[in-house]
Amino acid sequence: MRKILSTIFGLILLTAWVQAEPLSPADVKSLLARIRDMRVKSPHVQADFREEKTIRLMNKPIVSAGKVWFHPPNKFRREVRGNSPSVTVSDGQQLWIYYANFKSAEHYSLGKRSPVDAAIAAVNTALNLENVENTFQISGRKIDNGYELELLPRSPSMKRIFQRFNIRINSELLVERTEMVQPNGDRLVTTYSNQTRAPIPASTFEFTPPPGTEITTPLGR
């Protein structure tokens, strides 16, 4: 389950709060409205990413990099490059995680109120900022080149997934950096670059396992 959460949080995308100007509740509400309007006009987002995962029981963080494609509310593709390549794809109805080195894939059916559904819903709510005020306590600050938002979960179910979620947004209202802290102290920081809102082909969110792939269904369905 931790592997799935880390993969999802890696999408989906923190500077010091020094010299930042706090936003009033009205300012936060206005900013959220602007972000939603922008995503209605240009829903597609793709970017390169670098992820640094700090786990309590490990001395060094785990670093990975690759590219991500996202179409709200729940379609995404995430390709990790390097020595341990992987591909994670969701079309909103099913989720695939493919490990090229092992020629194996995990398959999850979505929409069945599983832990995976809960995790995806939590992150999508945070990143899409749809009705986010009902799920999180939100504070924000204006920085030189954009904004920073801190999201604290309200419900017990959300608190089991993460303790807090910080988002840095640039002046073009694109996510530049996210930081997620889990209840056990694990920390995931993802930075994004080369963002674009260019249209993404529907086939990007489709996945067919290569011949010979060993397929497992960890949740049994």
Model-derived features: positions:
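Positively charged n-region of N-terminal signal peptides that target proteins for export
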Residues: 1-4
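N-terminal leader/targeting segments and the immediate start of mature chains
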Residues: 16-61, 209-221
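Short beta-strands and strand-coil junctions in structured, solvent-facing domains, enriched
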Residues: 56-57, 77, 84-86, 97, ...
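An acidic-aromatic
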Residues: 67-119, 188
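Gly/Pro-enriched, hydrophobic low-complexity segments
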Residues: 106, 131-220
